[in-house]
Amino acid sequence: MSVLDVLWEDRDVRFDVSSQQMKTRPGEVLIDCLDSIEDTKGNNGDRGRLLVTNLRIIWHSLALPRVNLSIGYNCILNITTRTANSKLRGQTEALYILTKCNTTRFEFIFTNLVPGSPRLFTSVIAVHRAYETSKMYRDFKLRSAVIQNKQLRLLPQEHVYDKINGVWNLSSDQGNLGTFFITNVRIVWHANMNDSFNVSIPYLQIRSIKIRDSKFGLALVIESSQQSGGYVLGFKIDPVEKLQESVKEINSLHKVYSASPIFGVNYEMEEKPQPLEALTVEQIQDDVEIDSDDHTDAFVAYFADGNKQQDREPVFSEELGLAIEKLKDGFTLQGLWEVMS
């Protein structure tokens, strides 16, 4: 099983997660912690805390920690600043985050309740940019710019453990002769005749590493995760002793990586935040039974509403007997009540 098969933190948007899911996973690092942040779209008027890690953004209510959000960076489509109406700050500059999870778009608005502080914007935008520019650590890549002058272009924090010449890539009928690099982050192979014919396989994406028989004899076979396309790649390493030694080394490095992954998202704050465990409040179980099979409508408030710039005008609803924001064309109150049915 690849590390990616159990990694959800940067690849999902979740609502009201358990205290266990709010804790950092191996390799996840808390970069910044901002108090007095309002979730203006879903919990307007509720003071909360925003935690920025190298994989996601976590927001939780200070009054009710079980009211929370976990937003993975891989789901973020766009981050902008706009004016929003906060119950605690009035009209103020806010951070807008548009996300897409599976086929559903969610929009989040966060307001810093500390006047004149740009830290909310700088932290989230900078860390997300660091995530976007470090995909070589995490993504399976074919024909990328990983080789320069026959040498591997090392990533920060990357170290080469072995370089093996004369390794055949068995992707074609006759095979391609090339060079094989084993590092603490990934495996890279490139053709000797053409540097651009290459493959970079992060340990994060590796599902299995085995020795199998092929028409070329015994070969190293690497299977990648389903998320990367489920590739099966074969490499011929001679002699057999070197093949066995290499497989043992790769399995060992993969095991070390799985225990403490290097995600490559590097951003240093001047002030170091406390550990995440010290910042999240333990959720107290109410004296009631919770049916986990029931659907939760916690996410309904966050559905992305097109390019809405401001609230629509209030209108009187005879059905409810109070003033409500005018519904979008094609929407009805009855339909909104049935959104989860």
Swiss-Prot record:
A Pfam family it matches: BBL5
Keywords: Cell membrane, Cell projection, Cilium, Cilium biogenesis/degradation, Cytoplasm, Cytoskeleton, Membrane, Protein transport, Transport
GO CC, any one term: BBSome
Biological process, per Gene Ontology: cilium assembly; protein transport
Superkingdom as given in the UniProt entry: Eukaryota
Annotated compartments: Cell projection, Cilium membrane; Cytoplasm; Cytoplasm, Cytoskeleton, Cilium basal body; Cytoplasm, Cytoskeleton, Microtubule organizing center, Centrosome, Centriolar satellite
Keyword Heme: no
GO molecular function: phosphatidylinositol-3-phosphate binding; RNA polymerase II-specific DNA-binding transcription factor binding
UniProt key word Cytoplasm: yes
Main location: membrane
Described purpose of this protein according to its UniProt entry: The BBSome complex is thought to function as a coat complex required for sorting of specific membrane proteins to the primary cilia. The BBSome complex is required for ciliogenesis but is dispensable for centriolar satellite function. This ciliogenic function is mediated in part by the Rab8 GDP/GTP exchange factor, which localizes to the basal body and contacts the BBSome. Rab8(GTP) enters the primary cilium and promotes extension of the ciliary membrane.
Record family assignment: Belongs to the BBS5 family.
Subunit structure: PPart of BBSome complex, that contains BBS1, BBS2, BBS4, BBS5, BBS7, BBS8/TTC8, BBS9 and BBIP10. Binds to phosphoinositides. Interacts with CCDC28B. Interacts with SMO; the interaction is indicative for the association of SMO with the BBsome complex to facilitate ciliary localization of SMO. Interacts with PKD1. Interacts with DLEC1.
Name of the protein in its database record: BBSome complex member BBS5
Taxonomic placement: Eukaryota, Metazoa, Chordata, Craniata, Vertebrata
Gene name tied to this protein: Bbs5
